[in-house]
């Protein structure tokens, strides 16, 4: 090493003495680039909408296995706008987010690169990834019905369309329709039944509400527990989070008050949504970003998703956790999830018209 440095200094002195500035700059650039590549820190920068407690264990395991450090910027909103503003100067290598609509926004703004990875295409079914392989689902959640154990027979509702039945008038609670989760649900109904029937369904659903849409999914379970309503729409993982919530033990009682109903089991299957990720086209650490994305689709990470977060694995070779399995097997709607994003604007117009 010392001999190499001495040689470099000798050559630099020779170049400078000849006052050949161009050669000096070219040579210096080559040498600097060489040593920078050899000693560059092995890292990957992640911009994430996902809560730190949900994803940091995955990153820690990835670093143990690969030696690649994961730097994370967590945010509740604004990541799309940030990457757009930063452009080619962004530090982001990998985007992680929930809901297909958010993933698609990055594609629509030409911020994600097409990924050529046999690992990803083998691990993730085609309906759970972008048609051009610009994003890949990393976990699934089913949007199910939560029904009162005391007041609603679990087999009295078969399909999501049944919520439009007037017999449920004053019995249903939901969060606002414009939330990503409900908008995607409505998009799935548009895909299945057409826009006109979907709007009729949404209008009748609003007529059946026990109260104005408010709160998050857990707030709907609380409302059932308190007798405000009998039926709610919620993502499956919230049931697990309430059931085992030691920090807020009152939520355990909310979970005890409800049964989960998977809908549309005799036809298209229960609507699902995803959390996923994609590599930023400006990424400075593309190989590391792809490696992390691949890691998140492998069996160990997929098992961890199911165990920690109460989410369903997207890799078909990985079984749901024991807890998830105890909720029952279900048939899922295998509509390509990117179709949900395509129909989201139409769904939002319906939501606005019916006042959901």
Residue positions per predicted region:
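Ligand-binding pocket segment of bilobal, Venus flytrap-like solute-binding proteins
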Residues: 188, 193-261
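A bilobed periplasmic-binding-protein/Venus flytrap-type ligand-binding module shared by bacterial periplasmic
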Residues: 144-151, 264, 272-285, 304-307
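A structural signal for short loop-to-beta-strand junctions that line the ligand-binding cleft
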Residues: 90-95, 113-145, 161, 171-174
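Periplasmic-binding protein-like
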Residues: 170-177, 295-316
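An extracytoplasmic/periplasmic, membrane-proximal ligand-sensing/linker region
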Residues: 198, 310-356
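Short helix-loop capping/hinge motifs at secondary-structure junctions, enriched
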Residues: 150-158, 190-199, 283-289
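Early extracytoplasmic/lumenal segment of secretory-pathway proteins
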Residues: 40-105, 356
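Short beta-strand->loop
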Residues: 47-50, 131, 147-149, 155, ...
């Amino acid at each position: 090493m010392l001999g190499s440095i001495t040689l470099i200094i000798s050559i630099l002195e020779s170049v400078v003495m000849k006052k050949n500035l161009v050669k000096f700059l070219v040579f210096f650039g080559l040498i600097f680039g060489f040593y920078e590549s050899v000693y560059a820190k092995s890292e990957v920068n992640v911009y994430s909408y996902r809560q730190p407690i949900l994803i940091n264990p995955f990153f820690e395991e990835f670093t143990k296995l690969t030696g690649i450090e994961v730097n994370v910027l967590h945010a509740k909103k604004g990541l799309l706008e940030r990457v757009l503003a930063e452009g080619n100067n962004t530090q982001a290598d990998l985007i992680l987010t929930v809901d297909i609509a958010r993933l698609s926004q990055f594609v629509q703004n030409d911020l994600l690169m097409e990924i050529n990875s046999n690992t990803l295409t083998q691990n993730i079914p085609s309906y759970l990834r972008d048609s051009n392989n610009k994003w890949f689902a990393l976990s699934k959640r089913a949007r199910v019905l939560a029904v009162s154990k005391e007041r609603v027979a679990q087999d009295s509702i078969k399909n999501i369309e049944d919520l439009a039945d007037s017999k449920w008038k004053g019995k249903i609670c939901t969060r606002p329709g414009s939330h990503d989760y409900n908008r995607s649900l409505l998009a799935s109904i548009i895909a299945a039944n057409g826009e006109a029937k979907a709007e009729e369904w949404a209008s009748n659903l609003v007529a059946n509400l026990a109260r104005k849409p408010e709160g998050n999914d857990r707030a709907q379970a609380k409302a059932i527990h308190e007798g405000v309503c009998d039926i709610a729409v919620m993502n499956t993982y919230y049931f697990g989070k309430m059931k085992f919530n030691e920090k807020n033990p009152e939520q355990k009682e909310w979970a005890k008050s409800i049964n989960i109903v998977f809908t549309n089991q005799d036809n298209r299957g229960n609507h699902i949504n995803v959390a996923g990720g994609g590599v930023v086209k400006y990424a400075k650490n593309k190989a590391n970003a792809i490696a992390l994305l691949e890691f998140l689709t492998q069996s160990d990470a997929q098992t961890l998703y199911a165990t920690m977060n109460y989410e369903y694995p997207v890799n078909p070779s990985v079984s749901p956790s024991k807890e998830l399995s105890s909720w029952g097997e279900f048939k899922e709607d295998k509509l390509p999830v990117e179709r949900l994003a395509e129909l989201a604007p139409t769904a939002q117009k319906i939501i606005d018209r019916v006042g959901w």
